[in-house]
Amino acid sequence: MMNMIQRVAANRHGRDFVVGDIHGWYEPLMAELEAVCFDPALDRLFSVGDLINRGPDSERCLLLTEEPWFFAVRGNHEQILFNWLRQPDGVDVEMWLRYGGKTWLGTGPEHYFLRHPQVRRQAETLAERMPWVIELELEDGRRIGISHSTFPLDEWEDLVLRLPFEPALQEALLWERPIKQPGFVRHVDGIDLTVHGHVVVPRVERRGNGIYIDTGAALFGKPLKRSSRTHNPRITAIEVGELFLIPATPAPSPLAFD
């Protein structure tokens, strides 16, 4: 059975950052890392998933998982890819292409992977080892839980026990959008903070002990007439210690991009 929860020890030599959804935007990610003076020899980057689709460099973003300083949970966009690799007939390819896959897959995944077998091999490896959840230890003993869309339970240890055996719980970690509910707040016991992406927010938000960090890579190149609140979509990377300083956020209506 694959290890669905990856536990990562504290970084004793450098800094740790978390980053929101990347969606194939490699160059904006590199610009953000340069802005925070990221040092790949010492620092580490933890991703909430959705590395691929929509942007022009999905391959380069997917291959970041080969770097020793890069850690990522799977997002719903990776899971669509993994589902196709496992059972092509079980995936609506036209929907996938409309959902942002066309930017790198062209007319479809079958032809693309025939031309790029090395990317297919990397994706097949990730399908077997990419976790649903990362548990990150800090030097002071605090712990941060990272998953793509949310943490759907009230107790951290419940997830540890149930995740391998409950497909519905696995789906919830990839697809649920509770932050879109007015007034949503959840405090997860047994973990100090949780960090998520999936739903675009105009700025990093805290609900209970959950941090939502997807500030809009999905919006790059899109007209923003749907909302005047997100006038500056970006990829956001935050040092983990700073997450604890983010105040609780009143519950606005996040944007309908994921």
Language-model features and meaning:
Residues H116-R203:
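His/acidic metal-ligating clusters that form di-metal
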Residues M1-L62:
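N-terminal active-site segment of His-dependent metallophosphoesterases
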Residues V18, L45-S47, A72-V73, G145, ...:
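Residue-level marker for buried hydrophobic side chains located in beta-strands
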Residues R15-H23, R143-T150, Y212-I213:
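Active-site-proximal beta-strand elements of phosphoester/diester hydrolases
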Residues D21, D50, T65, G75-N76, ...:
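Divalent metal-coordination and catalytic microenvironments
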Residues S58-E135, D140-R142, Q170-E176:
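Active-site neighborhood of divalent metal-dependent phosphoester bond hydrolases
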Residues A172-A248:
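Conserved beta-sheet core of the metallophosphoesterase superfamily
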Residues H23-E27, N53-P56, Q79-F82, P152-D154, ...:
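Active-site environment of divalent metal-dependent phosphoester hydrolases
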